Amino acid sequence: MWTPELAILRGFPTEAERQQWKQEGVVGSESGSFLQLLLEGNHEAIFLNSMTQNIFSSTTTAEEKIDSYLEKQVVTFLDYSTDLDTTERQRLIFLLGVSSLQLFVQSNWTGPPVDLHPQDFLSSVLFQQFSEVKGLDAFVLSLLILDGESIYSLTSKPILLLLARIILVNVRHKLTAIQSLPWWTLRCVNIHQHLLEERSPLLFTLAENCIDQVMKLQNLFVDDSGRYLAIQFHLECAYVFLYYYEYRKAKDQLDIAKDISQLQTDLTGALGKRTRFQENYVAQLILDVRREGDVLSNCEFTPAPTPQEHLTKNLELNDDTILNDIKLADCEQFQMPDLCAEELAIILGICTNFQKNNPVHTLTEEELLAFTSCLLSQPKFWAIQTSALILRTKLEKGSTRRVERAMRQTQALADQFEDKTTSVLERLKIFYCCQVPPHWAIQRQLASLLFELGCTSSALQIFEKLEMWEDVVICYERAGQHGKAEEILRQELEKKQTPSLYCLLGDVLGDHSCYDKAWELSRYRSARAQRSKALLHLRNKEFQECVECFERSVKINPMQLGVWFSLGCAYLALEDYQGSAKAFQRCVTLEPDNAEAWNNLSTSYIRLKQKVKAFRTLQEALKCNYEHWQIWENYILTSTDVGEFSEAIKAYHRLLDLRDKYKDVQVLKILLRAVIDGMTDRSGDVATGLKGKLQELFGRVTSRVTNDGEIWRLYAHVYGNGQSEKPDENEKAFQCLSKAYKCDTQSNCWEKDITSFKEVVQRALGLAHVAIKCSKNKSSPQEAVQMLSSVRLNLRGLLSKAKQLFTDVATGEMSRELADDITAMDTLVTELQDLSNQFRNQY
């Protein structure tokens, strides 16, 4: 390995490395001068160097495409230049590629703006076909489009990314002397991806290959120096996987980084005050950070902290009630160690992963604020400070007491890009481990915040300056100015016709012809055009046409999560369950934590009669969203279908947690039959063993739903319906049947319909027989008499109602349909009276 490679990755050399380079003659070589400029952060000087000028000085024709020309010149220098040996040429081109990437990052992420123009280092013939630099930029941006996804139109100095991509991606196979090249390719890919509207499968495949290659570089992560670099690498991998929905892989990478650092982080409670006038200390959520070891003690391999005056200022809250920070009762108990750059980056990574894997909720926001407070308590590095402040502003914008600071802080974050007092070298420290958004994304966040606060004109000014026409349209649409939205889009189309503008016009007008024009302009490669056209079909319930457009869109770019979900819904509407299953399967592959997609996938499997698959997918859905009662309802039905009776009981309990009065009599009947009949579940176990759990469930159900006679009767059946060998179970069954009878007689109109009346009579007779059986096991004669008297009163009441309601007025005769019931009730009343007398004689 070329000795400076580790320093280039790290961003700075150690003193020992400088001495080693002198001994090896690195400093005096051509690549040594490039290396010196790179490590000083003077990237422009590399492009103005005579060596770079010579590489790109070859004549060309005006018709030659700029990417072809650049690649040809680089390859020619690598293969045919005789002034330097092969290894030296590779080193020079590598350093030029890294400088291109760093300058591009400076131009669009860190600032300050770069004062370098393509004319400074490229042949003037290349610019003859462009009347202005903006025309060149637009052409270069078109070359950077991948998988049919549009790229941000005001990206600054795109020629630098194009050159970095040519060197670090296209001709990487020729740079065999540079072992760390795959890592820089990964960084280039990551930066390129963040310019695209959607995730690119091509870039993800390339990123995965780069990660695999770096993993195989054993000598990259040895000794103390390698330990720091290993943490940085695994953090960068985690962010890549997070972006492409590979949440498990992202967590694995974060865990590796955390294990290497031996850093322990826990959200915990501590006594503290949050307001100025608070008298008592109460529990506050904080992040407790501890070191388990001292593996990162060699500070020469970690970036030196940036002076605070060169960091974005953490603005005060300036509230008359809420304190700027939580005031802890015992500050020393949770004293945080002095953290290095890599340790702070790990905390930021854990925070970002936590945010991605948890729902938007007040508790989640409090937990994230604990992370940001921890990070901001040690302001040391521009990238970490900026990332933490951006997250905090997003969290605070919903608070009336904090929104004013959120706006001021976002403005300060947006303004820092132009600030030239902080060197780019300081801003690039630990940059690739932090996923800082580009500067236009911060300005967009500011405009969105202004719009939410009602400052529509200020928000529009920023959006129009950024040429974010979609946001401009949204502003006008929400303000009810539909005509203005159309007008501004047509004005921009007069300047230049682009697929994105036609798609937006189609969104405003609801006109398919606009999407067709966008599709045509993109040479049939715009995933956005087909996506937007499909969504219009979906709104119009034209499902077949919708499916066709969505299929074309995902064929161009298969990593569109929202499109796969909408495609699945369209297939469901068409009752094409094979298609919907495929779409939702792709959806959950991209985002394993998408509960709704898992739920819809299970619906598809149910319709395809694949109930076991449906059961498993619903289990995944519940892992993602434990609070979604509709998913639990699907789960309980599927559980009973596949014979997972224990899971069905658990699901019923959860539904009672979520919906206080929830009831499903059909499910209760199935569970009862399974337990009583001794049915086997999906695992082959006999369901009789669930009797205790079922009794517990019925107890809970009847405590919530007290007025359903059928549920009370089912509950009685759990205890044998009064026919058990155990007296206590018969007693319990009698109580349930009594409550069921009470529910029956309190319902409307049961006595006016003879069929309903006969049902109630039969239930009263059954209750009386259970009472007789229970009374014989009573230890107290008084209790036995009381029980018998209550059922005798029921029967007498029914006899009275029968004579009152079902006697023919003309003949004075009782209805023949009730003759047998009347006889049975008379007989039983007499028996109950006799039995009561026997018990009274025992007083």
Swiss-Prot record:
Which PROSITE patterns does the entry link to?
TPR (PS50005), TPR_REGION (PS50293)
Q: Which SMART domains match?
A: TPR (SM00028)
Highest taxon of source: Eukaryota
**Cysteine pairings via disulfide bonds:** none
Record bears the keyword Hydrolase: no
- Transmembrane region positions? none
Keyword annotations of the record? Repeat, TPR repeat
State whether keyword Repeat applies: yes
TPR repeat ranges, renumbered to this chain: 453-486, 492-525, 527-560, 561-594, 596-628, 629-662
Tell me which family the UniProt entry assigns to this protein.
Belongs to the TTC27 family.
- Protein name, per record: Tetratricopeptide repeat protein 27
